[in-house]
Structures are given as C-alpha cells and as structure tokens.
Amino acid sequence: MPNIIRKLVENDKKELKKLNRMALQVESFADEMEHLTDEQLKAKTPELKERIAKGESLDDLLYEAFAVCREAARRVLGLYPFHVQIMGGIVLHNGDVPEMRTGEGKTLTATMPVYLNALSGKGVHVVTVNEYLATRDMTEMGELYSWLGLTVGLNLNSKSPEEKREAYNCDITYSTSAELGFDYLRDNMVTRAEDMVQKPLNYALVDEVDSILVDEARTPLIISGQAESSSALYYRADQFTKTLKGQNLNVATSEYEEGDDYKIDLQSKTISLTEEGIDKAEKFFQIENLYDMENVALTHFVDNALRANFIMLHDIDYMVDENQEVLIIDQFTGRTMPGRRYSDGLHQAIEAKEAVPIQDESKTMASITIQNYFRMYKKLSGMTGTAKTEEEEFREIYNIQITPIPTNRPVQRLDHPDLLYPTLEAKFKAVIDDIKRRHAEGQPILIGTVAVETSELISKKLVEAKIPHEVLNAKNHFREAQIIMNAGQQGAVTIATNMAGRGTDIKLGPGVIDHVDPEFRGLAVIGTERHESRRIDNQLRGRSGRQGDPGVSQFYLSLEDELMKRFGSERVSAFLDRMRISGEDAVIKSGLITRQIESSQKRVEGNNYDSRKQVLQYDDVIREQREVIYAQRQEVILATEDMTPVLMGMFKRTIDRQVDGHELAGSLKDEENVKNLLQTLHNTMLPEDGIELSELTGLSVQAMKDLIFDKVKARYASQMEKLSDPERQLEFQRAVILRVVDNNWSEHIDALDQMRQSVGLRGYAQNNPIVEYQEESYKMYNNMIGAIEFEVTRLMMKAQIQPQTAIRQEAPRMTTTASQENITNVDTEHSVSEEISFENVGRNDLCPCGSGKKFKNCHGRTHIA
C-alpha cells in the first residue's frame, strides 16, 4: 500500500512540474499582450478563429489564447489570473479536474479554458449548482467574453423554447445540470426539428463538479405524465401506520425492542413490519394474509407509509411550505429542490403523513441519469476544492483525473481536533459557550449544521443568550447571498445548514484579522456534527482561511449524533468506558476518535458510491436502447425525402410476424386457421375486399407472405394518392411514426422503471438483479420494436385520410403521455374485430396477431377470461 501511495504522489509531482512549465509559457506572452491596444487585443479572437478554420488545433493555440484572455480579464474585470490559476485552467482544458482550495478563484480560472474552447464555435456549457450562481457568473464573466467578441447565453427553467434556443446557439452557455438534462430529454420528445433547442454536446465545464457529478448522481432526471390517482389508499395506509408502536429514526438507539410493530435498520435506513405489525395490518385491513399476491399493491402503500412516518424526517429530508407543498431538502446543500419529487409513491405517502393535498402519481415518459447525460459530451471537466476523496469514482465513471493545484498563498487556518461529548445536550452547551467566547472578542463565526432542525435549535439558544445572528437554511434560502456577504464582518454570527452558501465568497471585514491572539483571527468555523461525506466537512472548513487569510475550525460531536449511531458508536462508547471518561460534560480529544469517525464516513461514502454505481448500471442497460430510439427519432424529424423505403421494411416485418404467429398457433394448411389469419389482416391492415379467403387457401407460408405484402403495397399506394403533394405525404408519414414511437417508448420506460423496482427481490433467489434486468429489458425492447412496427402498419393502412386537408403534428405536452396527443385529421377506422380463437398459445407467449404484445395482454384477454 505505501508503494501505491508513493507512486500516486510522484505522479502528482510530475504532472505539477509539467503544468508549471506550460503556465510559464503562457506568462511569456504577458509583455506582448500588455502592449496591444484594446482594438488589437479584441482582434485576436477572429484571428485565432481563422487559424482554427485553417487546421490548427486548440492545443496549438493554448498559450496565446490563455494570454489573450488573461490580459482581457485584467482590463475588463480588474483581475489578473495568478500562476496557479493558469495551471488550473490547463487541467480544465485537458478534460480533467483541478482540485483548488476554496477561495483560490475557480471562477476566474475557468475563463481561460472557456475562451479557448469557445473559439471552435461548437459551444461551451458552463454548469453550476443553481440558477442564482449561473446568473451571477454569466453576468460577471459574460462582460469579459463579450468584450472579446464571443456571444454568451443564460439557460434558465423559466425561459421559453425560443429563448433557450438562442442561449444554446451562443458560443458560451451558462446553465444548471438539471436544466441541461431536461432540455436533452425534451428535445427528444418534440415532433419538429425547429422545436429542438440544444446543439450537439461539445464541452462542459462543471463548477462544483463533486456536487453535480457525485452528489446529484443518485437522482435520475425524469419527465413524467400523470397516472391514475390513489389518494384514498395513501390516507388509509397512513392511518394504519399511525397506530403502530416503535421508534423514529432520529431517536432510535437500537434497531428493535421487544413488542415493537416495526424495526429500523439504522445503517441502510430501511424499515419492515415485525410479526406483531403484520398481525395488526391484517386486522386493520381485514385480510387473511398481508403478503398474498392479491395484496401486493396494499403492501406497497404500507411500505411507503412506514418510510414516510418513521424514516423521512420533517425539516431534515423535506419541509412543508406555506402553500402546503412538500419540498425535498437537498442533503448536500441544505436547499429545497422545487419541482423534484420522490418517486414510486413515497412523495404521496409523505403528503398523507403531513395531511396536505396529495398530488397524483406520475408515469415516467423520459429519463436519464446525470452520469449518462454528461458522458455524452465530447469533453468534460470541472472544478472543486474537494474532489480527491472521490478520485476513484471520477476515474471509473467519467474517465477524469484529479490534479491537486497548490494554493497561491500558504494556508494559515488552524484546524483543531474534534471534540467528542457523551450527549447532544452536553455538545450544544459547549458549542454555545464557544460562540459566546468568540463573539465577545468580535470574531465572525460561521456555525455549520446538518439539518434545519439543528439550525433552529442553536438559533433558539443564541436568542436566549442574547447573541444577534442570521440563520441560513432551506426555509430562507432567498436571502442566501446577502447573509453570506455579511458573514465575515466583525461580530457576525451566521448559522448555515450544509453550507448552503457554497459558491458565494465570505469576505472578511475591517479589523477581523488584527486580533493579537491567532485563535480569534479571521473567520471561525464551528461544525456541530460530522456530515456523512468528508467532502461536505472540508467544504465547511474551507469557508475560512481563503487566499492565505487567518482562520480557525472546530468540530463538536456527540455519541448521539446520527453518524455515530449508524456507524461505530458502540466501539467509541467502549473506548470511553476503558478510559473511564464519564459525566455529562466529559469531553475527549483523540486521534483514535477522529480516525474512527473518518472510517465511518468512508463506509458511508462507499455505500453511497455503490448506490450511485447501481443507478448507473441500471441506466446503462437502457442507455443503448435510448440512444437508438432517439437517433431514429432524429432521422424521422430531420427527414427531407419520402420515407416509403423505411415503412416498407416495417410492413414486411409485421406481415412476417403475423403469418409466423398464426403458423405457430396451428398449421396454415388448416382452413380454420387461415380464416383466423384473414380476420386479423382485415382488422389490422387491409379492407374487407382487400384480400379474400380463396386467395390464401392452399398457399405455402412464404407465398402467403409475398401475396399479403403485394396487397399492402397497393393499399399504401392508394393511401398516399390521397396526399398528392410529396410534402404532405412526408408530414403524414412523420406524424404517424412519431406518435407510435413516443407512445410505445414512454410505455416501455415506465414498464422498465416498475421492473427495476421489483427485480431487486430476485436477489433473494440467488439471482443477480442487474443480469435479470438486462435480460428482461432486452426482451421487452424487442417486443416494443415489434409493437411499434405493427402499430405504424395499422395506422398507415387503416387511417381515414381527408384529401386536400392540412396535417399538423404537435409536440406532446409534458404533463401527459404521448398517446393522449391527437394527430389532426388522422383518424383510425373503428372496425369491430370478431373474436379469434387461438389454441396452444401460452399466456406469456407473443400474440400470434403480430402486435408485439404478450398473448395475455392482447387477444388472449378474451381467451383467458
């Protein structure tokens, strides 16, 4: 192990030497650039663009382009990038992550690679964690890029499609990660090329890359439509759950006590009914066996009600706003996430718990993970002060290396060892005493909490102590920038949940660094408990001691903290017993304790990484399917020529499936079976007089296929004659294909989503859930393709086309499924199908009619009934 560590350190040193040499080369252009007039410096942009057009690469232009941007920043912003910032900029251009300490000027560092890559004209996306930072950075840095002759756009959720398209067409576009992902999904739901907003994905530079590519990666981006409402069942399950006896997650000391109706696994935060709880459920719902197959839906509602009431904590996992809406709280930033909802009915269960209106469940129409979205960029890089702890994840998932960049000035912050107390009460008493002591000296103090609840508790105690202070949490995030701006002033006391002000500088006020005692110089950061991620702790610490300023950090912990309860509190308690440390005010400083806590954090980080990896593994299964469907959709939308050859392939395969299906159900030499086939053809693709029994009788299977195909071609030609204008024919073809593809694709991914939630149970049967999911999804995909081709054939053949009437296809509304959209002036004949009898067809076999659906979901419904 020491050899591996030594090797990594040596690699970092080699990389830094190389970056140092390259940065010196950029600096060698400084005099030349300084002597240029403003007009001459601005003229460098078109000159560099021309050199790219003539075949020079971006790497060839790096030194000169960086020097141009550096000099322009000095003139426009009054800021001149340091040597270490140039090094960071080179790492970003190379598609990697420079780890730069908080306060080292990451925003300015990004200007150089953004300028260089924007010269290609292919677009650069600068990605931030929220819309406030996107707007701020675009306003501040946009001035520099505009001065240099580049166009800058801002992409926000509130923008119209026209405004979004304009923003994406700029050389540089500022946006949030979620908005980029949703725009990609929406672009693949439109029905006209002119409605698309994004260009091909080229280069993304992600600010706070660990927050976006790691923390947010557990939450897939989903566009959904409404499913049927089940409000009454949520309320009923909630009523039952409130009758149960047991412990809440926030006060649980053990997983289960004798007589409890449910038990909680503290490590995985899962919950299940005990035997006593199951008995109560069966009596409450008046059923014999809760886990009978017929009660599967009920157990789903009960499980969600259990999680909502005993695992999901008010003001920690979510809050209820003044509009009686349940808002999720981001566990890493402390901000609320409007528009985001827990999936699979959990959000509705929380709404029932809080007695607020229950919103309808949703049906997935399009989805993608953050990981798979960003992996589509040709080049991806990002900036953060805390990425080294997630180095393996960046390398394995994104193929990105982390390069630590030295600070411009040495760090002067004093980082004290953790202080551990036996109880929460003793810990908070010590925190308040420390705040009083530092406040009396005029030192600005930033208190970091993990939950809104804790921030309000400390605020209450500070009010009692008559110490003026500000609270920054999910409930007042709109004042975030203003609160953080004043947090460095003399005597300021600020409480922040999960450092919600990340990305906003805390500038020290006059007199703050002049105290005679180093302990009271600069900003004091007080952590009230360790977060489950070491990065979040490091981000909190990093608010102090920026750019070589003095500062101090101190974490206060207790054995009753959530992290300690979940991991390792028994060992720590045993250690305290051995050391004979007892009493409410007992406190311990020990390297062993700190190491124990760090190993607990590593375990949580490992669990979280596994969780993100699993999300990615499931999404990887449908990634290829999504890319194929979206690529084919694009071809249809962008088609300028008649799509008859494509349609003929669909007709041919549909006919083959129908004939082969009937042959499997019973020999087509039998006249009764031929009649069944004829009835199917009349129902799905040919009129009554289009083909007759006598024409099919006595033919071989292949001869039947050829005859039917000839008849279908003739029927298609007569349909197209009603649309004499080639442009109208193309629009009709496009409308039919897109309607069918969108309907079937949304059904497919919703089915995959439901299967993913159930496939995990197969692990109990010693089956690998991922492998099972891959195999099932592949079968479902092939069935979907068959269903698409069948439905397109049916619509093209049976649609009643009104001659000389314009056809217009509209994009599907995001709140509904594509199947609910109407295609103007295209209607399907309502032919009543006669019941067809199929012998020897299994329930789960494909229906012989060729629809691509399982027999039990198609003609088998009547047969099985």
From Swiss-Prot:
It is a peripheral membrane protein. InterPro entries: Helicase_ATP-bd (IPR014001), Helicase_C-like (IPR001650), P-loop_NTPase (IPR027417), SEC_C_motif (IPR004027), SecA (IPR000185), SecA_CS (IPR020937), SecA_DEAD (IPR011115), SecA_motor_DEAD (IPR014018). Zn(2+) binds at residues 847, 849, 858-859. GO terms for biological process: intracellular protein transmembrane transport; protein import; protein targeting; protein transport by the Sec complex. GO terms for molecular function: ATP binding; metal ion binding; protein-exporting ATPase activity. May bind 1 zinc ion per subunit. ATP binds at residues 85, 103-107, 505. Monomer and homodimer. Part of the essential Sec protein translocation apparatus which comprises SecA, SecYEG and auxiliary proteins SecDF. Other proteins may also be involved. Belongs to the SecA family. This is Protein translocase subunit SecA. The gene is secA.
